[in-house]
């Protein structure tokens, strides 16, 4: 693997994407059979991409797949296997020395495994033995709240519903979830602002908008199929503006792999009409600057007898809190706005002008907005900006959070939450006849804190790589090994499985692409995309191993063993997933006619009250919510210090590392790098390719023991006073205390650091 730093000249997509897909397929898949499966991905009679949550178009192409979707499916359907013979040759201690890419690249898990501390190896056991032993451990705990039930966003609606049902009959609301680490500020912030913790737009709105503002996200890597929608809106004359600390190729220009003309002529579509490199942690200052300009210009228009710049009728009829917001933003000083955002008043005025001129605006955002100590307030400032011009609840306008995992939104909809509503719990009671717990449980940060303090005794993970995804993994690694029980439901080996508890199990499950055969026949599961569309997913491939079970079957097996007197007919439900969906419909009225509607091509849309200008808030209206000050990360407020954000590489999806390249950013064969601007490198007196150390700072600005040594400097077009490193390697630079108090999300995108040359 050749290591090099070399500027990539191509557009996003194009032949570079095609070559990358070909390499992924060649290295992982049985071409004779499995490539055919890609033609069934994201199709009504096929399976949903296990990657991102971008919605499927109503009229999809014959090959509706993106580069990273192809990598995800190649990773899943690999013909490599991790079985008993693999573990006979590799102890857990030896596997801990492997890289995270190497661990998952070893192949698919194909049989139930139990850790044996004498041999330091995982050894096979029968499914029933695994269920019985896990059930016995769960029965032994005096307090159900000693168990943490983690969920990954790849889990289907059906499996997630059964999982929460099991945990609540067990009498726990401990539901740490991957969304706690990515879009929890969306769920919390939007619910408070507009009454719905989800986005308000549909894919069709991109066909009607005048302007799309993309802030804090990187579609070329994290949701590449979005580029097709951005290309289409630019082609018809609408504008897209990008706001991001780094210049990301997927926001700049795109060659559509499905477009023969662009591919054959090497032509491309310019996406962003303007690009603003806001400093890391400067979004709130920028947004308040935009709102201040809009209000001042609206006041001037009013005084001159010109038409209002804002939507006064909408503000008066549909909102509360505007006067308080107005006072706050008008009191924000320009010198502070410019210093914190890194943008001049002139640049911010350009943004405000573009927004003022557009009749219909969509704001798309990702974790660059949410993963801050004030991530919830960040989201709410985006809503404030939209509300000022009535851009919620009309065609071609709205808020568009870009979710990660393909069903992370659906899991929450069907009950994966540590704070369930009383109405939801009452309906569970009515349907099943047991009284679920009402006290709030643990989200991700509280869950890890409970593990670190010894309060938690067991961890069950429905997918994911919990230990690697969390902050401060050095502090949490030993407590994880001191748990009494760890159960990992997974398709591939990862580092979390190697931090073995007293009793550790790995339970292998089917992938999204594989046929799920139950007593009534082949089953479909359902997922919810970022725009609240529910659709079916049906595996088409032969399972990787004869012993694999579905997630639904695994949940039912554990539940039956742990709850011998259960009132739930677990086996009956798993025989036919229509029965699970009937129960979901009974508990959640918005799923009316669930089984009928998922049989329609494309599925159905869950009602979004805010999109219809029905405000399910305590005020009965949309709320302008003021956030005091301009800092979205108070612990980073040291003027002389650098701020570091963690990001994915292009060969990566969440904690899964497909390869060692980051093509669009020009990094190949390596991940031990730190990105900085040429201006910042000059200030720090370092050059491209030199090695440096980063030291994390405490909240009072002192050097901590958390550090990253010998990172290679990569000079990159980006904001100054900002550094970027790769997730999850840099997660340990953040403590469990560095999180948003409203949503609990860790501040992965704003870690104060110092830089020094490496010896």
Swiss-Prot record:
Name this polypeptide is given: Protein YdeP
For this chain's record, the cofactor binding note is:
Binds 1 [4Fe-4S] cluster.
The UniProt entry's sequence similarity note says: Belongs to the prokaryotic molybdopterin-containing oxidoreductase family.
Entry function: Probably involved in acid resistance.
What causes induction of this gene?
By EvgA.
Q: Which InterPro entries match?
A: Asp_de-COase-like_dom_sf, MopB_CT_YdeP, Mopterin_OxRdtase, Mopterin_OxRdtse_a_bac, Prok_molybdopt-oxidoreductase, YdeP_MopB
Does Manganese show up as a keyword for this record?
no
> GO cellular component annotations, sorted alphabetically?
membrane
For this UniProt record, the keywords arranged alphabetically read as follows: 4Fe-4S, Iron, Iron-sulfur, Metal-binding, Molybdenum, Oxidoreductase
Keyword Iron applies:
yes
* Gene Ontology MF terms in the entry: 4 iron, 4 sulfur cluster binding; formate dehydrogenase (NAD+) activity; molybdenum ion binding
Name any cofactors this protein relies on.
[4Fe-4S] cluster; Mo-bis(molybdopterin guanine dinucleotide)
Q: Where does [4Fe-4S] cluster bind?
A: 49, 52
The scientific name of the source species is Escherichia coli O6:H1 (strain CFT073 / ATCC 700928 / UPEC)
């Amino acid at each position: 693997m050749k290591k090099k730093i070399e500027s990539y000249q191509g557009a996003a997509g194009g032949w570079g994407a095609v070559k990358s897909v070909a390499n992924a397929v060649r290295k992982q898949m049985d071409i004779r059979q499995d490539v055919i499966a890609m033609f069934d991905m994201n199709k009504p009679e096929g399976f949903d991409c296990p990657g991102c949550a971008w919605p499927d178009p109503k009229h999809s192409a014959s090959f509706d797949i993106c580069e990273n979707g192809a990598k995800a499916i190649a990773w899943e359907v690999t013909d490599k296997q991790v079985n008993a013979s693999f573990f006979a040759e590799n102890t857990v201690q030896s596997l801990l020395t492997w890289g995270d890419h190497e661990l998952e690249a070893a192949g698919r898990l194909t049989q139930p495994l139990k850790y044996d501390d004498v041999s330091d190896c995982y050894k096979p056991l029968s499914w029933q033995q695994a269920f019985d032993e896990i059930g016995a451990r769960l029965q032994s705990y005096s307090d159900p709240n000693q168990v943490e039930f983690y969920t990954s966003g790849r889990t289907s609606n059906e499996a997630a519903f059964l999982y929460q049902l099991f945990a609540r009959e067990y009498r726990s609301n401990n539901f740490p979830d991957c969304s706690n680490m990515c879009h929890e500020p969306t769920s919390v912030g939007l619910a408070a602002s507009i009454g719905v913790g989800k986005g308000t737009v549909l894919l069709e709105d991109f066909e009607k908008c005048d302007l799309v503002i993309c802030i804090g996200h990187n579609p070329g890597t994290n949701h590449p199929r979005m580029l097709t929608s951005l290309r289409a809106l630019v082609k018809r004359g609408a504008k897209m503006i990008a706001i991001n600390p780094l210049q990301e190729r997927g926001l700049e220009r795109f060659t559509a792999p499905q477009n023969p003309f662009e591919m054959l002529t090497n032509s491309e579509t310019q996406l962003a009409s303007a690009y603003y490199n806001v400093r890391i942690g400067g979004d709130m200052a920028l947004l308040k600057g935009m709102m201040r300009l809009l209000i001042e210009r609206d006041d001037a228009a009013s005084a001159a007898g010109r038409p209002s710049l804002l939507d006064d009728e909408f503000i008066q009829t549909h909102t509360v809190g505007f006067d308080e917001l107005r006072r706050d933003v008008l009191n924000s000083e320009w010198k502070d706005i410019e210093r914190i955002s890194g943008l001049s008043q002139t640049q911010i005025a350009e943004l405000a002008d573009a927004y003022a001129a557009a009749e219909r605006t969509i704001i798309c955002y990702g974790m660059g907005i949410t993963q801050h100590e004030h991530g919830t307030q960040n989201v709410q400032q985006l809503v404030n900006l939209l509300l000022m011009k009535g851009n919620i609840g009309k065609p071609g306008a709205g808020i568009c959070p870009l979710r990660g995992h393909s069903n992370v939104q659906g899991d929450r909809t069907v009950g994966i939450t540590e704070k369930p509503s009383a109405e939801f719990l009452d309906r569970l009671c009515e349907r099943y006849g047991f009284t679920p717990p009402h006290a709030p449980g643990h989200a991700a940060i509280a869950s890890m804190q409970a593990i670190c303090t010894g309060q938690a005794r067991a961890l069950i993970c429905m997918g994911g790589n919990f230990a690697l995804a969390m902050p401060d993994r050095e502090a949490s690694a030993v407590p994880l090994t001191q748990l009494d029980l760890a159960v990992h439901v997974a398709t591939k080996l990862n580092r979390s499985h190697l931090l073995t508890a007293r009793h550790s199990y790995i339970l292998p499950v089917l992938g999204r692409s594989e046929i799920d055969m139950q007593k009534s026949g082949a089953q479909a599961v359902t997922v919810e995309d970022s725009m609240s569309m529910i659709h079916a997913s049906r595996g088409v491939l032969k399972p990787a191993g004869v012993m694999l079970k579905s997630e639904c079957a695994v949940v039912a097996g554990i539940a039956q063993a742990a709850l011998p007197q259960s009132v739930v007919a677990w086996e009956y439900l798993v025989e036919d997933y229509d029965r699970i969906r009937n129960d979901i419909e009974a508990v959640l009225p918005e799923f009316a006619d669930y089984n009928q509607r998922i049989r329609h091509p494309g599925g159905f849309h869950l009602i979004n009250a805010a999109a219809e200008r029905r405000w399910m808030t305590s005020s009965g209206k949309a709320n302008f919510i003021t956030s005091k000050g301009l800092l979205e990360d108070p612990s980073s407020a040291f003027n002389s210090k650098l701020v570091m954000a963690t990001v994915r590489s292009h060969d990566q999806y969440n904690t899964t590392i497909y390869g060692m390249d980051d093509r669009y950013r020009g990094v190949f064969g390596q991940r031990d790098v730190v990105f900085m601007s040429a201006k910042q490198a000059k200030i720090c007196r370092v050059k491209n390719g030199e090695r440096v150390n980063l030291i994390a700072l405490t909240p009072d600005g002192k050097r901590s023991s958390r550090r990253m040594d010998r990172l290679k400097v990569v000079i990159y077009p980006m904001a100054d006073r900002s550094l970027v490193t790769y997730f999850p390697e840099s997660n340990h630079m953040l403590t469990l205390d560095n999180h948003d108090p409203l949503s609990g999300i860790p501040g992965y995108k704003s870690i104060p650091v110092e830089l020094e040359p490496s010896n």
